[in-house]
Amino acid sequence: MEQEQDTPWTQSTEHINIQKKGSGQQTRRLGRPNLTQLMDHYLRIMSQVDMHKQTVSWKQWLSLKNPTQGSLKTRALKQWKLFNKQGWTD
């Protein structure tokens, strides 16, 4: 019998039942994740993605050399429009 390979996805989303065999060995049976587990996993992943986007955005801001008030305003408006457009399409 072929054993299933655990991936980060199955480890974090699938409910694992551990049972003991007669020989004392433990077997793992992967069950279907419930809605709460899936939502929890989704929110964790999206939070990580959002933090990464924020970090990248701040690095871009900090990399600007001698920004003027006008260039910062223009850049902020572009970022805001892009963010709003992505927010509605996701």
UniProtKB/Swiss-Prot annotation:
Identification of the protein by name: Protein PB1-F2
Main location group: host cell
Site note Low pathogenicity, residues: 66
Region of interest (Disordered), ranges: 1-30
Subunit and interaction comment: Oligomer. Interacts with human SLC25A6/ANT3 and VDAC1. Interacts with host MAVS.
Disulfide bonds: none
Organism this protein belongs to: Influenza A virus (strain A/Memphis/1/1971 H3N2)
Highest taxon above the source species: Viruses
Miscellaneous note of the record: Is not encoded in all strains, and seems to be dispensable for replication.
Family per similarity comment: Belongs to the influenza viruses PB1-F2 family.
Ranges for region Mitochondrial targeting sequence: 65-87
InterPro entries xrefs: Flu_proapoptotic_PB1-F2 (IPR021045)
Purpose: Plays an important role in promoting lung pathology in both primary viral infection and secondary bacterial infection. Promotes alteration of mitochondrial morphology, dissipation of mitochondrial membrane potential, and cell death. Alternatively, inhibits the production of interferon in the infected cell at the level of host mitochondrial antiviral signaling MAVS. Its level of expression differs greatly depending on which cell type is infected, in a manner that is independent of the levels of expression of other viral proteins. Monocytic cells are more affected than epithelial cells.
GO BP of this protein: symbiont-mediated perturbation of host apoptosis; symbiont-mediated suppression of host cytoplasmic pattern recognition receptor signaling pathway via inhibition of MAVS activity
This protein's UniProt keywords: Apoptosis, Host cytoplasm, Host membrane, Host mitochondrion, Host mitochondrion inner membrane, Host nucleus, Host-virus interaction, Inhibition of host innate immune response by virus, Inhibition of host MAVS by virus, Inhibition of host RLR pathway by virus, Membrane, Modulation of host cell apoptosis by virus, Viral immunoevasion
Bias (Polar residues): 1-28
Keyword Protein transport: no
